[in-house]
Swiss-Prot record:
Pathway: Amino-acid degradation; L-phenylalanine degradation; acetoacetate and fumarate from L-phenylalanine: step 5/6. This is Maleylacetoacetate isomerase. Residues 4-87 form the GST N-terminal domain. The keyword Flavoprotein does not apply. It holds the Pfam family GST_C_3. The keyword Transport does not apply. It comes from Dictyostelium discoideum (Social amoeba). Keywords: Isomerase, Phenylalanine catabolism, Transferase, Tyrosine catabolism.
Length: 219
């Protein structure tokens, strides 16, 4: 670990890394990008060297302020607490709770159930590679059904009112995944509307997969 140097271990298409990239952009924190390819060499996150940084062998990992932090949602909380400038949460306690509720729907109920590791297990135990997309669509649809209702009640320009929150940092990557797995977005007008707004904001554009140094041509 390099003292006083911020380093993000990331993969261009990783949903969890994407959230952190947006946060770092909003907080105006300069960092070094170190690519960890999730497929090459059997998964570079499984290497002995990287495992010393992150015992879960997952990304992202952030080196910052002399510390090493894994898990994207924990990283977001740390950045908000230690770098209060350009806040990423609403002021009101209730609004903050709703933002965290939305964040957890994506970060706990949807994305982990359709990530690369889980889809690999689906194919392995079913013996049918085509089941991966079917499973992902089911998981995303179930989660979006609940998220859409919350956005109908609480959203403005952003997921919660008219200011950015952790929920917004999680949304674009999940919509990206929904599109990858051909989820019908017609039933989700509020998710679509908020996501379209987010993708006009410079910090969100900077964090897009295709704008990362390790982006691959098929993006």
């Amino acid at each position: 670990m390099t003292e006083n140097k911020t380093v993000l271990y990331s993969y261009w298409r990783s949903s969890c890394s994407w959230r952190v990239r947006v946060a770092l952009a909003y907080k105006k924190i300069k960092y070094e990008y170190k690519a960890i390819h999730l497929l090459k060499d059997g998964g570079q996150q499984k290497s002995d060297e990287y495992s010393k940084l992150n015992p879960m062998k997952a990304i992202p990992t952030l080196e910052i302020d002399g510390h090493i932090i894994g898990q994207s949602l924990a990283i977001l909380e740390y950045l908000e607490e230690t770098h209060p400038e350009n806040p990423l949460m609403p002021k009101g306690s209730y609004e903050r709770a709703i933002a965290r509720q939305m964040m957890q729907i994506i970060g706990s109920d949807i994305q982990p159930l359709q990530n690369l590791k889980v889809l690999g297990l689906i194919a392995q135990y079913s013996g049918d590679d085509s089941k991966k997309s079917e499973w992902a669509r089911t998981v995303i649809t179930n989660g979006f059904n609940g998220l859409e209702k919350l956005l109908e009640k609480h959203s403005g320009k952003f997921c919660v009112g008219d200011s950015v929150s952790f929920a917004d940092l999680c949304l674009p990557a999940q919509v990206y995944n929904a599109n990858r797995f051909n989820v019908d977005m017609t039933p989700y007008p509020n998710i679509t509307r908020v996501n379209q707004h987010l993708l006009t904001i410079p910090e969100f554009i900077e964090a897009l997969p295709q704008n990362q140094p390790d982006a691959e041509p098929q993006c």
